[in-house]
């Protein structure tokens, strides 16, 4: 799917170097196609790196996707130039009256922070409530899953004693579900979180369908029956070296982090890791875009007919 982004966005050249099909806004205007409008609420500190990761997964299908980047934290960023944020991100007030085919809410490094202490918690809640009336389908990733479960279902924050970090085996529970179409019976996916998502809690306190679980990582992929909500508790968007970067960051800070599970060859951080989850990540996002967004969204976004209570 050619992703439609501003001509000057750094991700354009980065992804083209990987032979990813990126269509600039100027070229897209020459095609008489109604693109899917996807809003990405990027909560990660290294925003450019996260943009590259998610845009890569949104890029592999024949339809156009018009990407809009959203921020809700007005504080000065330590990891992303202000010029980049000003040029490529919108504020919520800019889009609150608009409708979108899809919304992606990324993770955030807030695993040990109480919800009440998250500076932009009111803004997160506002976006999630707004999406009920303005977005066809929303995909929550990692920490955003925990936030959404609290806001939508009243589930309190659950935290692991030790950080879950590594590449874990997962089991597909519903291979014929639309979101898992084409999934292997077992596959690998990376996790990096303190958040805990016990399968029994999801089943007891929500009406969500658990599609994939992991013996070590708990519930991995679950969704609402009307396809308007999807939750992935891991990081299928991660690059091969993302977990390594987190490990060495914490090691250099004197935090004595555990070596990520099933990641470095022979568990040796001096050896370069390889991505073993890339095909799964692409398939997950293609399925979400096709079955949860494209197949159910109205052609005219002014005629949204939300069914989410």
Curated annotation (Swiss-Prot):
Subcellular localization(s) per the UniProt record: Cytoplasm
Reaction(s) this enzyme catalyzes, per UniProt: L-homoserine + succinyl-CoA = O-succinyl-L-homoserine + CoA
Enzyme Commission number, as recorded: 2.3.1.46
Annotated site location: Important for substrate specificity: 192
One MF annotation (Gene Ontology) recorded for this entry: homoserine O-acetyltransferase activity
Principal cellular location given in the protein's record: cytoplasm
GO annotation terms (biological process): L-methionine biosynthetic process from homoserine via O-succinyl-L-homoserine and cystathionine
Annotated residues for binding of substrate: 163, 192, 249
Recorded metabolic or biological pathway in which this protein acts: Amino-acid biosynthesis; L-methionine biosynthesis via de novo pathway; O-succinyl-L-homoserine from L-homoserine: step 1/1
UniProt site positions, description: Important for acyl-CoA specificity: 111
Active-site residues annotated for this sequence: 142, 235, 237
UniProt enzyme class: transferase
Cited SUPFAM superfamilies: Class I glutamine amidotransferase-like
Record's keyword terms, sorted: Acyltransferase, Amino-acid biosynthesis, Cytoplasm, Methionine biosynthesis, Transferase
Coiled coil (UniProt feature): none
Cellular component GO terms, alphabetical: cytoplasm
InterPro entries: Class_I_gatase-like, HST_MetA, MetA_family
CDD domains in the cross-refs: GATase1_HTS
Alphabetical list of PANTHER family matching this protein: HOMOSERINE O-SUCCINYLTRANSFERASE (PTHR20919:SF0)
HAMAP family per UniProt: MetA_acyltransf (MF_00295)
Family: Belongs to the MetA family.
NCBIfam families per the UniProt record, alphabetical: metA
Function: Transfers a succinyl group from succinyl-CoA to L-homoserine, forming succinyl-L-homoserine.
Protein name: Homoserine O-succinyltransferase
């Amino acid at each position: 799917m050619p992703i439609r982004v501003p001509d000057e966005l750094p991700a354009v050249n980065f992804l083209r170097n990987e032979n990813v099909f990126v269509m600039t806004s100027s070229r897209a205007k020459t095609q008489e196609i109604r693109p899917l409008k996807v809003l990405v609420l990027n909560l990660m500190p290294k925003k450019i790196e996260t943009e590259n990761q998610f845009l890569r997964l949104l890029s592999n299908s024949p339809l156009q996707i018009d990407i809009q980047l959203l921020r809700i934290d007005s504080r000065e960023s330590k990891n992303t130039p202000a010029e980049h944020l000003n040029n490529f991100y919108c504020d919520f007030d800019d889009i609150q009256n608009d409708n979108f085919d899809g919304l992606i809410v990324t993770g955030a490094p807030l695993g040990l922070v109480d919800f009440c202490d998250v500076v932009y918690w009111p803004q997160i809640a506002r976006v999630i409530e707004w999406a009920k009336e303005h977005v066809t389908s929303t995909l929550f990733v990692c920490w955003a899953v925990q936030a959404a479960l609290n806001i939508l279902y009243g589930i309190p924050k659950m935290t692991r004693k030790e950080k879950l970090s590594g590449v874990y085996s997962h089991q597909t529970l519903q291979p014929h579900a639309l979101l898992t179409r084409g999934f292997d019976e077992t596959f690998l996916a990376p996790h990096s979180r303190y958040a805990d998502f016990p399968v029994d809690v999801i089943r007891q306190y929500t009406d969500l369908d658990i599609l994939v679980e992991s013996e070590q990582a708990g519930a991995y992929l679950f969704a609402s029956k009307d396809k308007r909500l999807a939750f992935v508790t891991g990081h299928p968007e991660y690059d091969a070296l993302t977990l390594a970067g987190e490990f060495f960051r914490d090691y250099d800070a004197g935090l004595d982090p555990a070596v990520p599970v099933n990641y470095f060859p022979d568990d040796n951080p001096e050896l370069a890791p390889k991505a073993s989850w890339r095909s799964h990540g692409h398939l997950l996002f293609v399925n979400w875009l096709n079955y949860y967004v494209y197949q159910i969204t109205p052609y005219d976004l002014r005629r949204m007919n939300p069914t989410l209570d």
